[in-house]
Amino acid sequence: MARFFRRRKFCRFTAEGVKSIDYKDLDTLKAYVSETGKIVPSRITGTKAKYQRQLATAIKRARFIALLPYTDSHE
């Protein structure tokens, strides 16, 4: 029987020593938003709860100011 070993998920923000997540840093925020525009959960990305809360708030702020779209482009 084959055993699959998953790579250990780690929090990128903890590793880089980030104090707070800025809503104007769009490159970082886009990495944590799915193709459909949903915020990717921490169980998939591996971010810690503290940073996941900051990330969600930053994404919501960026959406409100129209820096990020709420959904994907409908064609």
From Swiss-Prot:
The keyword Transcription regulation does not apply. The keyword Metal-binding does not apply. InterPro entries: Ribosomal_bS18 (IPR001648), Ribosomal_bS18_CS (IPR018275), Ribosomal_bS18_sf (IPR036870). It comes from the Bacteria. One of its GO terms (biological process) is translation. Part of the 30S ribosomal subunit. Forms a tight heterodimer with protein bS6. HAMAP family: Ribosomal_bS18. Binds as a heterodimer with protein bS6 to the central domain of the 16S rRNA, where it helps stabilize the platform of the 30S subunit. This is Small ribosomal subunit protein bS18. It comes from Saccharophagus degradans (strain 2-40 / ATCC 43961 / DSM 17024). The gene is rpsR.
